[in-house]
């Protein structure tokens, strides 16, 4: 069975699609369009990596659904260990800033 025939891979693709939609919803159309093209031709790895980078760079608040799906994708396969670690560190730092009063939280999607 090829990797792309497994439910785990389908969830990885869904995560990439969710990140692309998230970027588009926040006005980052160039990034979203580029990642969509990469997803269509090369699979979800680079779009997920780019999504994490954009979330961190633009200081965005990911949805709870995205956080949950990313955790599930990470638990099921090793494809995104580095990106998941960056994502979790970013979320922890945002939580620490929020608790210390340094950050006014934007509304979550």
Each language-model region and where it sits:
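C-terminal-biased regions
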Residues: 1-109
